Amino acid sequence: MKNMLLMSGSKYQNTDYLVHTLPWLQDFLADYQGKTVAFVPYAGVRQSYDEYELKVQKALAELNVAILSVHRAEKHAEIIEKADVIAIGGGNTFCLLKGMYEHHLLPLIREKVQSGTPYFGWSAGANVAGRSIMTTNDMPITYPPSFDALNLFPHQLNPHFISGKPAGHNGESREERLAEFLIVNPTANVYALPEGTALHIQGQQARVLGQHDVLLFSENMQLATLPVNSVFDY
């Protein structure tokens, strides 16, 4: 049974890196004390993979799991194959997906998660769990072979969702960008995750976690609100 924790981002308000996720992860990894977590760092553009791995190790030290970045092996897939848990970090979603294609990780991760290996990711790491990365907020600074992602959650995700426009901003709002996507892709569903929220997916159900409701946008920008702690079939 699929068991995934898809988190909007690594911070909430003024909290330090990944601090607000620790209660969720403590529950999520309760049965994996002392186990190995394969970490995929490809989204980290402004830091080396070594630096990214260390940053996550320090942030999650109290969880009593071994964080091992896939770049530590010549064949990155080997670490995924042996891992008890899979984690994918945030950053640039295009770089992340390109790296996953280059190292042939998508079918392997998909198979392992469908077979029950826990998966958690934040920001870009949540985005790639969905059908495609077409609703990321990131600049396309590189070009993956396809926008198709893991499709473990067979819908679109939009992490870091914020409604409306900041004062003085004259570009498109997030709602306007998602409206554009739904005009071109009218059969899609987009789950918008505000900061401080997550989806805990178990099998074919998902629970909303965090401080805010999750929003579901569908054709013609129909809006459904998914309250905190609600459970829905997807």
Curated annotation (Swiss-Prot):
<keyword id="KW-0224">Dipeptidase</keyword>
<dbReference type="GO" id="GO:0005737">
    <property type="term" value="C:cytoplasm"/>
</dbReference>
<keyword id="KW-0645">Protease</keyword>
<keyword id="KW-0720">Serine protease</keyword>
<dbReference type="Pfam" id="PF03575">
    <property type="entry name" value="Peptidase_S51"/>
</dbReference>
<comment type="function">
    <text>Hydrolyzes dipeptides containing N-terminal aspartate residues. May play a role in allowing the cell to use peptide aspartate to spare carbon otherwise required for the synthesis of the aspartate family of amino acids.</text>
</comment>
<comment type="similarity">
    <text>Belongs to the peptidase S51 family.</text>
</comment>
<dbReference type="GO" id="GO:0006508">
    <property type="term" value="P:proteolysis"/>
</dbReference>
<keyword id="KW-0963">Cytoplasm</keyword>
<dbReference type="GO" id="GO:0008236">
    <property type="term" value="F:serine-type peptidase activity"/>
</dbReference>
<protein>
    <recommendedName>
        <fullName>Peptidase E</fullName>
        <ecNumber>3.4.13.21</ecNumber>
    </recommendedName>
</protein>
<dbReference type="InterPro" id="IPR029062">
    <property type="entry name" value="Class_I_gatase-like"/>
</dbReference>
<feature type="active site" description="Charge relay system">
    <location>
        <position position="160"/>
    </location>
</feature>
<dbReference type="InterPro" id="IPR023172">
    <property type="entry name" value="Peptidase_S51_dipeptidase-E"/>
</dbReference>
<feature type="active site" description="Charge relay system">
    <location>
        <position position="138"/>
    </location>
</feature>
<dbReference type="InterPro" id="IPR005320">
    <property type="entry name" value="Peptidase_S51"/>
</dbReference>
<keyword id="KW-0378">Hydrolase</keyword>
<feature type="active site" description="Charge relay system">
    <location>
        <position position="123"/>
    </location>
</feature>
<dbReference type="GO" id="GO:0016805">
    <property type="term" value="F:dipeptidase activity"/>
</dbReference>
